[in-house]
């Protein structure tokens, strides 16, 4: 669910399993203050607690609400962009996971479709969100200073093609890698569903209405990547916690080289 900054900052403090957690504002404003040096554009997604109160009009009461999952995305301005893509730095936290966690990460976003692009695990930091303890925001400065090699990967994919006669074999490899590939940051294992590979395959060679459909000839690796990341990015809010990890796994499933950011 997308909301405004004002609505976000109304999030109440909460107690989970006898542990006290701060208000939403206490967690997000130090991040927003740091990123406001670079941008004034923030996108916010949340998942409220399962039990919510309604006002007299039957609408969600934002004056009495707890957000269990929060994603604040700071969208960087033009000087950080490159053709067809922008960059963003995000703070994401979840209180209702097995261990409450928070993540700070940088990724690229394709302007035309808002698909995430992730090629380096070094752009992510994951920490346990301990009760009655402030977050450590130092990685914000670090990630802004890392060299972003996304442009190199995008150019490489644009010049790489999958031979059409091998697409059936590739589907088998993709499904196998979805089964075997995993991302573990120390707070649980993240995987791509096998159906992700099948759905991406359909977008590439079956669904004629798909933006990534290739009617004839070889298939551009860039389109294959976008078909996968479209599924991960636009999952109707089912999983906002692990989008970075799942998007990174797309590159692994497609057999793309890992990027090391310095």
What is each residue range found by the language model?
Residues 46, 65-262:
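Intrinsically disordered, low-complexity regions enriched in serine/threonine
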């Amino acid at each position: 669910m997308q909301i405004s900054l004002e609505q976000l900052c109304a999030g109440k403090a909460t107690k989970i399993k006898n542990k006290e957690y701060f208000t939403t504002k206490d967690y997000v404003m130090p991040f927003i203050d740091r990123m406001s040096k670079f941008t004034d554009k923030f996108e916010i997604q949340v998942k409220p607690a399962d039990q919510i109160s309604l006002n007299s009009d039957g609408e969600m009461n934002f004056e009495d609400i707890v957000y269990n999952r929060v994603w604040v995305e700071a969208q960087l301005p033009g000087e950080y962009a490159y053709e067809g893509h922008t960059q963003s730095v995000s703070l994401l936290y979840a209180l209702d996971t097995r261990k409450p966690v928070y993540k700070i990460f940088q990724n690229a976003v394709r302007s035309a479709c808002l698909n995430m692009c992730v090629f380096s695990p070094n752009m992510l930091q994951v920490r346990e969100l301990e009760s009655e303890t402030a977050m450590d925001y130092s990685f914000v400065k670090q990630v802004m200073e890392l060299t972003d090699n996304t442009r190199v990967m995008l150019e490489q994919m644009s010049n790489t093609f999958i031979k059409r006669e091998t697409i059936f074999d590739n589907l088998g490899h993709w499904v196998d890698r979805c089964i075997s590939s995993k991302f573990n940051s120390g707070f649980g294992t993240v995987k791509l569903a096998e159906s992700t590979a099948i759905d991406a395959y359909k977008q590439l060679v079956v669904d004629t209405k798909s933006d990534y459909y290739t009617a004839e000839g070889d298939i551009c690796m860039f389109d294959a990547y976008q078909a996968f990341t479209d599924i991960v990015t636009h999952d109707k809010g089912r999983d906002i916690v692990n989008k970075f990890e799942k998007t990174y796994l797309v590159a692994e499933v497609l057999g793309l080289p890992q990027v090391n950011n310095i």
